[in-house]
Swiss-Prot record:
The gene is pdxA. Pathway: Cofactor biosynthesis; pyridoxine 5'-phosphate biosynthesis; pyridoxine 5'-phosphate from D-erythrose 4-phosphate: step 4/5. Keywords: Cobalt, Cytoplasm, Magnesium, Metal-binding, NAD, NADP, Oxidoreductase, Pyridoxine biosynthesis, Zinc. Homodimer. It comes from the Bacteria. Its EC number is 1.1.1.262. It comes from Escherichia coli O81 (strain ED1a). Gene3D superfamilies: Isopropylmalate Dehydrogenase. This is 4-hydroxythreonine-4-phosphate dehydrogenase.
Length: 329
């Protein structure tokens, strides 16, 4: 019999829709135990606002994990710094959010949890609380002391990884170095094999410039950097197609023969994916020593506590994490 696993969940910004989505997740059965790293009153108050049943069970790390029954969650308590009003940010709770992320991350690193799923955070309020914070990806990279991580977003039909993430456009060309591409492609290839169960990953690689540089007439990064790296990695046996112009890569004749796309920067690859599957997408951090998935949307403060938040992306993120757990066992 396969051992039941524990998955830890962080709701994210307490004034946003994260707690709503957690309560909605609890309304169905799950084959894993859902351990929510959060404030108890926050969850029970939000459940009452939504008119949904919720029983919180204490987290018992020394007891065997049990599949989650509908209407329940396992609670790993972290106490709010300030009381929460749905839809209204409180700066001090930026500390609370980071505490939940740190505890969940540490639990994955010490083997308590098989995967981590994160709800949406408000980066601005965390920084306003005096905590430098760029995003989940960078936070987990630093805390886990990972050498390098890669952001990938996915729907059921498409996976897009990023060579660079939250950089100003003016800095991207300088950031695309041979060392970076070697690292990113190696991590992408490795995790597609080990976490997604793809024996021989096929990766499409975008060029950096319009028309992938047009033979050097619209930029030379393809000739100077991208093509040499791809040739070296092909010699190692990787199946890489590119560099291809990003404006024509996202069509069936290419995508039907690929397992993932590597875009050179954030707004090159993600608009297509989000147009195709917004609300159904999942953010995955590759290169971490544990499985981490996340929703692909923000805090939606205006919807908090109103029963109008769509739980679809959270369900997809949890289901994908469960599949990845199975692939790594």
């Amino acid at each position: 019999m396969v051992k039941t696993q524990r998955v830890v969940i962080t709701p994210g910004e307490p004034a946003g829709i994260g707690p709503d989505l957690i309560v909605q997740l609890a309304q169905r059965e799950w084959p894993v135990e859902l351990v929510v790293c959060a404030d108890a009153t926050l969850l029970t108050d939000r459940a009452a606002m939504l008119g949904l049943p919720l029983t919180l069970r204490p987290y018992s790390p020394n007891s065997p994990a049990q599949p989650q029954t509908a209407g329940t969650l396992t609670l790993l308590p972290v106490v709010l710094r300030e009381s929460v009003t749905a839809g209204q940010l409180a700066v001090e709770n930026g500390h609370y959010v980071v505490e939940t992320l740190a505890r969940a991350c540490d639990g994955c690193l010490n083997g308590e949890f098989a995967a981590l799923i994160t709800g949406p955070v408000h980066k601005g309020v965390i920084n306003d609380a005096g905590i430098p914070f760029t995003g989940h990806t960078e936070f987990f990279e630093e805390r886990s002391q990972a050498k390098k991580v890669v952001m990938m977003l996915a729907t059921e039909e498409l996976r897009v990884a990023l060579a660079t993430t939250h950089l100003p456009l003016r800095d991207i060309a300088d950031a695309i170095t041979p060392a970076l591409l070697h690292e990113v492609i190696a991590i992408l290839h490795h995790d597609l094999r080990t976490k997604f169960g793809i024996a021989e990953p096929r990766i499409l690689v975008c060029g950096l410039n319009p028309h992938a540089g047009e033979g050097g007439h619209m930029g030379t990064e393809e000739i100077d950097t991208i093509i040499p790296v791809l040739n070296e990695l092909r010699e190692q046996g990787m199946k890489l197609n590119g560099p291809l112009p990003a404006d024509t890569l996202f069509q069936p004749k290419y995508l039907d023969n690929a397992d993932a796309v590597l875009a050179m920067y954030h707004d090159q690859g993600l608009p297509v994916l989000k147009y195709q599957g917004f609300g159904r997408g999942v953010n995955i951090t590759l290169g971490l020593p544990f499985i981490r998935t996340s929703v692909d949307h923000g805090t939606a403060l205006e919807l908090a506590g109103r029963g109008k938040a769509d739980v679809g992306s959270f369900i997809t993120a949890l289901n994908l994490a469960i599949k990845m757990i199975v692939n790594t066992q």
